[in-house]
Amino acid sequence: MNMKTLLALAVSAVCSVGVAQAHEHNTIPKGASIEVKVQQLDPVNGNKDVGTVTITESNYGLVFTPDLQGLSEGLHGFHIHENPSCEPKEKEGKLTAGLGAGGHWDPKGAKQHGYPWQDDAHLGDLPALTVLHDGTATNPVLAPRLKHLDDVRGHSIMIHTGGDNHSDHPAPLGGGGPRMACGVIK
């Protein structure tokens, strides 16, 4: 082998390693995931299956990918709640859907609702869930402060009837209103 051939091979090898490293750096490897069964809440007639939300680890945080149907069109508050329960409970003498889930998950004691990337807000605050006119939701949302599946195991996913302004004003907890659908994260 002559010197020119050796030099060409060496340059080619170095370039190949550089391209491989650049490609590896720009991809998002799919990590571990959990599939959560979601039900529309009805404390009187019983809950009804509406699909799943798959939670996946990524380099940028947890990704929540819904595969839901039969929901009302529009933006809906979407949160991680404290307890692994979607059961109804009584509040002020009235059976309330999903109350067994507790409040928004707030392990750091922020005591305020906010944006999913806001450090001084509930850790369970997620981007709003978009439901299309046909009642389906398939658009993933990213929770950048949540990094590992173990962060959310033993809690629940909650979808509220109304949207979410990511503030406690003018209405508390983003104004999402009643609990519409729920799933326990196992």
Curated annotation (Swiss-Prot):
Residues where Zn(2+) binds: 104, 113, 122, 125
Signal sequence residues: 1-22
One GO cellular component, as annotated:
periplasmic space
Keyword Zinc in annotation: yes
The main location class comes to periplasm
Q: Where in the cell is it found?
A: Periplasm
**Which cofactors are named for this entry?**
Cu cation; Zn(2+)
Under the heading SUPFAM superfamilies, the entry gives:
Cu,Zn superoxide dismutase-like
Q: Which residues bind Cu cation?
A: 79, 81, 104, 160
- Catalytic activity reported: 2 superoxide + 2 H(+) = H2O2 + O2
Q: Enumerate the GO terms in the molecular function aspect.
A: copper ion binding; superoxide dismutase activity
Listed GO biological process terms = removal of superoxide radicals
Which top EC class is given? oxidoreductase
- Tell me how the cofactor is bound: Binds 1 copper ion per subunit.
Q: Which Gene3D superfamilies match?
A: Superoxide dismutase, copper/zinc binding domain
Q: What are the disulfide bonds?
A: 86-182
**EC annotation from Swiss-Prot or TrEMBL:** 1.15.1.1
Sorted alphabetically, which keywords does the UniProt record give?
A: Antioxidant, Copper, Disulfide bond, Metal-binding, Oxidoreductase, Periplasm, Signal, Zinc
Q: Is the keyword Cytoplasm in the record?
A: no
Q: How does it assemble?
A: Homodimer.
Regarding protein family, the annotation reads:
Belongs to the Cu-Zn superoxide dismutase family.
Free-text function comment from the UniProt entry: Destroys radicals which are normally produced within the cells and which are toxic to biological systems.
What is the protein name for this chain? Superoxide dismutase [Cu-Zn]
**What is the protein's species of origin?**
Neisseria meningitidis serogroup B (strain ATCC BAA-335 / MC58)
Q: According to the entry, what is the taxonomic lineage of the organism?
A: Bacteria, Pseudomonadati, Pseudomonadota, Betaproteobacteria, Neisseriales
